[in-house]
């Protein structure tokens, strides 16, 4: 990677990953960090992105950042969207006798609506509707989902994320009560 920077005429001193940059920004802007002679403030950063989840544990004192552990898994928001898509595609296949995944336009419409539904569920535990007009062959389709069903669909991905969190906690040798809240 540094080779390409040198080709561009840039002198790169060091590269850092996303979570280290996040921790560094936290340490720079936090004014209430403990003095160097006091016990460190331990913070865990979790970034659940579109394609994966990153977790990092760091300890802070004024002017000092120590990265304790970091981890990554390939479970993110995209996986959640795909699980919802599969669920509704199966439901629409049974109810309306259509194969959603044979039609790219219909698949994209369904995925777009699933993303919207996921965002609504972040703030709502009630049963929420999904309605798509002129979905396939000019048919309107509808369904619904609540957060409990959503969590059931993504349970495997949540387990992957939990495993990364546990692995980071184990590697950092931190206990839950030692983490700053």
Predicted regions, residues:
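Oxyanion-binding/catalytic loops of NTP- or PPi-dependent enzymes
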Residues: 1-181
């Amino acid at each position: 990677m540094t080779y390409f920077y040198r080709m561009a005429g840039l002198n790169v001193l060091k590269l850092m990953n996303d979570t280290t940059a996040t921790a560094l920004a936290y340490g720079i802007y936090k004014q209430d960090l403990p003095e160097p002679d006091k016990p460190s403030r331990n913070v865990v950063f979790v970034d659940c992105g579109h394609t994966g989840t990153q977790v990092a544990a760091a300890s802070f004192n004024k002017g000092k950042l120590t990265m304790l552990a970091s981890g990554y898994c390939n479970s993110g928001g995209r996986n959640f969207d795909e699980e919802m898509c599969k669920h509704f595609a199966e439901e629409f296949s049974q109810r309306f006798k259509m194969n959603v995944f044979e039609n790219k336009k219909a698949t994209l419409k369904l995925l777009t609506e699933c993303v919207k539904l996921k965002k609504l569920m972040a703030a709502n535990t009630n049963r929420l509707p999904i309605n798509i007009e002129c979905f396939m062959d000019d048919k309107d389709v509808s369904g619904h989902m609540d957060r409990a069903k959503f969590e059931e669909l993504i349970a495997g991905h949540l387990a992957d994320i939990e495993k990364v969190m546990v692995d980071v906690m184990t590697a950092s040798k931190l206990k839950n009560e030692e983490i700053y809240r």
